[in-house]
Amino acid sequence: MTRLHRRPARGALLEYRTYGGWSVQRPEHGTLGRFSPDMTRVLPDGRTVALTLRLDRAAYQLYREAGASHSQALHNALLCPAFAGRYGAAARGAWELELQAPPSDRVELVAMLWPQDDRDWPRGEVNLLEGRVGTGQTMTNLHWPDIDGVPQHAPAMIDLDVSQWHRYRVEVLPGRIRWAVDGRTVRTLETHHAPIDTPVHMVVQAGVNPAIQDGWRDNFEWEQTILFRPLRAPRGGQLS
């Protein structure tokens, strides 16, 4: 492990893992597609991550030849991105990122804090933005377990065009979570469930809305890219 005592450098925030390299993993939550490591890459500017969603036509045809239905072949051939930051720290403090989604209502995405140890979930999940592009809204959310360990959450929609560049910020404070976009507070939640001591990391992932099937044709091609820049995280964390 590499321990960082000062505010993490941008390079540390760009260190990441992806999903789907060794087994089939999917975005789920009603979306289509499967994660593919090739769909996530750092651009030559050294500060922007491209997260691409793409229909692999060759894979679709191979699945069809193997006897898969159209819907199953499409589900398997839609390649999706995931960025799981390797820099983790206790959630307390400010986390910032910039993101621009493509102008396609076939794209669904989430940018969030996620617990370093999956066993801590739902504690540690804080959503900066979540939902389908093109609706004019996005969702902020906090997740936590109740006294019996049953997952609870507090979703709230905000009006926002996520296909434009925006700077997203969430502050995890004792008794309070505050969300801001472009320097303006858009939501404050007073809560006893702020995960101030839970180690978390940044995650961005995306899936394909099933409406993509509505435009299907024999020569159909499709590719969309989300651009993302991790900007700030609390100090004192480490690379996993």
Q: Which role fits each region the language model picked out?
A:
Residues 95-97, 164-172, 177-179:
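Short tryptophan-centered beta-strand motifs in secreted/extracellular beta-sheet-rich domains
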Residues 11-24, 129, 176-227, 236:
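Aromatic sugar-binding interfaces of carbohydrate-active proteins
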Residues 76-93, 157-164, 194-195, 222:
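Extracellular/lumenal carbohydrate-interaction signature centered on repeated Trp-anchored short motifs
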Residues 42, 112-143:
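Glycan-recognition/cleft segments
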Residues 1-104, 233-240:
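Low-complexity, Ser/Thr/Pro/Gly-rich disordered linker/stalk regions
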Residues 55-57, 99-101, 115, 172, ...:
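Short beta-strand segments enriched in hydrophobic/aromatic residues
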Residues 101-107, 117-120, 174-176:
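Extended, low-complexity, turn-rich repeat/linker tracts enriched in Gly/Pro/Ser/Thr and Asp/Glu
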Residues 144-167:
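Short, aromatic/His-centered strand-loop micro-motif at the edge of beta-sheets
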